[in-house]
Amino acid sequence: MVMTDPIADYLTRIRNANMAKHSSVEIPASSMKKSLSEILKNEGFIRDYQVEDDNKQGMIKIFLKYGPNNERVISGLKRISKPGLRNYVSAENLPKVLNGLGIAIISTSAGVITDKEAREKNVGGEVIAYVW
């Protein structure tokens, strides 16, 4: 089966595992997914991730994070720029997610970064997803 949007699949697997309160989820690896996982870890949305090499594509194992009363840390994930309709923004028009409570993940010439980092570097790019 050909996958038309691997980033949407990545976000959906995390969303589904989070809703089912799983402790971890395995996702086929790619450099973009590693960058997204690093951002989610740095922003505190996941506990950790590890890349497992299987001499093919490899897998990323993401360890989900929950609060002290087992409440979800990730409230929502939304894919913004899709293969059929790309969404690009300039540095002046970078989005704010829930007035700064969430993050927008942007693919820029400086790499895959959050909206906050993009504002600091004054760069625009493709809006990959919102996480809150």
From Swiss-Prot:
Keywords: Ribonucleoprotein, Ribosomal protein, RNA-binding, rRNA-binding. One of its GO terms (molecular function) is rRNA binding. Transmembrane segments: none annotated. GO terms for cellular component: ribonucleoprotein complex; ribosome. Pfam families: Ribosomal_S8. GO terms for biological process: translation. InterPro entries: Ribosomal_uS8, Ribosomal_uS8_CS, Ribosomal_uS8_sf. Part of the 30S ribosomal subunit. Contacts proteins S5 and S12. NCBIfam families: PRK00136.1. One of the primary rRNA binding proteins, it binds directly to 16S rRNA central domain where it helps coordinate assembly of the platform of the 30S subunit. Belongs to the universal ribosomal protein uS8 family. This is Small ribosomal subunit protein uS8.
